[in-house]
A protein has these predicted regions:
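N-terminal Lys/Arg-rich, disordered targeting/topogenic segments
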Residues: 1-18, 351-352
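Hydrophobic membrane-insertion alpha-helices, especially the h-region
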Residues: 19-34, 335-338
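N-terminal active-site segment of His-dependent metallophosphoesterases
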Residues: 28-109, 199
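Short, solvent-exposed beta-strand-terminating loops
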Residues: 35, 192-205
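A short C-terminal boundary segment appended to hydrolase-like catalytic domains
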Residues: 40-48, 254-259, 279, 286-352
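Extended active-site neighborhood of metal-dependent phosphoesterases/phosphodiesterases
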Residues: 40-46, 51, 55, 104-188, ...
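Hydrophobic beta-strand anchors of alpha/beta hydrolase catalytic cores
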Residues: 63, 92, 156, 188-189
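Active-site glycine-centered loops adjacent to acidic/histidine catalytic or metal-binding residues
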Residues: 68, 96-97, 126-127, 193, ...
């Protein structure tokens, strides 16, 4: 009886229904092929450092810093285009939250975004890379979680504090040795994802901001959870005369000093903007101008949605929806085709 029903179903509107089944099969095959295709990149940061070394850079020079693109499509693409076109910028540093989570396809999408970027691009690991199997995948693609390199008169140290607690004991030992070596250089730059402290004051702002704060006070503890570790790191950086600290994690722009050491939080590379403060909550990246004696950090703003909390919430929802559609477009097509088939089957059975 079932075979008869299937034959009867295919007999009606035969061409259309066979085409639908063929499309479902083809889309499923393409989706599987895409998923099992190797990502290609291996030890990305090591290769980027080698490219920088081959350039023989001397001071003065300029590099870019940004963070929290988190699978953003439109904003991050525009950011990369501007950085690539800027002749002053020789290389770039992405401070983490490269992806929304550790899903393989989200890493594939990020790699597709940066594979055509003409300048060396280095990364730090963010907390979103730790989700699912992301930590192991990050290591295979980008290499060690913390590392160092030199450019001209400057020493660059990239740390892993993505667990939001602090550094592991072996990373502490490594950091102290690196800071000792860095004393031979004029400038010492530190990069990590999670800031030592959250510079935002939840008691300030307009009524809209206070409502958002009341609904989610955790947002204002977007820093290392272990205050002792944060204090210890701040004192260590001050003791070794660090020139500048760069962090992200907070989707905004902040600058100031931790134990006398200048810091900049730059989390405006495309992830959702929660706040609506015109002085801080906008898309942006940094240009860091390194001279023989001085360092200047220049803020470069990008097109940003209006500063209204309702529009910001809609924009945040659209950022996630757009990224999901771009990354999982094959699966979405497959889902729509299957739904169409089920609706057609339901109508056919209902007529009988």
């Amino acid at each position: 009886m079932r075979k008869e029903r299937v034959s009867e179903y295919l007999a009606e509107r035969r061409t259309l229904r066979l085409a639908l089944l063929a499309l479902i099969l083809l889309t499923a095959i393409l989706s599987l092929v895409s998923y099992f295709t190797p990502l290609g990149a291996r030890y990305w940061n090591y290769k980027a450092i080698k490219r920088i070394e081959a350039m023989g850079i001397k001071a003065p020079f300029t590099f870019a810093v940004f963070g929290d693109n988190k699978n953003s499509s439109r904003v991050f693409k525009g950011l990369l285009r501007r950085v690539a076109a800027d002749r002053e910028i020789l290389f770039a540093m992405d401070l983490g939250d490269l992806v929304y989570d550790g899903d393989k396809e989200k890493f594939r999408y990020f790699l597709n975004q940066i594979k055509g970027f003409p300048k060396p691009l280095l990364t730090a690991i963010g907390n979103h890379e730790l989700r699912e199997e992301g930590r192991a995948l990050y290591y295979r693609l980008f290499g060690p979680y913390y590392y160092s390199f030199t450019v001209g008169n400057s020493y660059f140290i990239v740390l892993d504090d993505a667990n939001e607690a602090g550094l592991e004991p072996w990373e502490w030992d490594w950091l102290r040795k690196e800071l000792e070596k860095a004393q031979a250089y004029r400038h010492r730059f530190i990069f990590f994802h999670v800031p030592l402290y959250d510079p935002r004051n939840p008691g300030q702002g307009n009524l809209e901001s206070k409502i958002v704060i009341a609904l989610g006070k955790k947002m204002f503890a977007h820093c290392l959870k272990d205050r002792r570790q944060a204090d210890k790191l701040a004192k260590l950086f001050a003791r070794y005369h660090v020139t500048h600290i760069f962090a992200s994690h907070i989707h905004a722009y902040y600058t100031g000093r931790w134990d006398g050491v200048p810091f900049t939080i730059t989390g405006g590379a495309g992830a959702e903007l929660v706040g609506n403060d015109p002085e801080h909550d906008f898309y942006h990246y940094l240009k860091v101008h390194v001279g023989r004696e001085r360092v200047k950090v220049e803020l470069v703003k990008l097109p940003t949605p209006p500063y209204h909390w309702g529009i910001r919430l809609l924009e945040a929802a659209w950022v996630y929806l757009r990224s999901f559609m771009v990354i999982h477009w094959l699966n979405l097509i497959l889902f729509i085709l299957i739904v169409g088939l089920l609706v057609d089957l339901h109508r056919f059975w209902k007529k009988r």
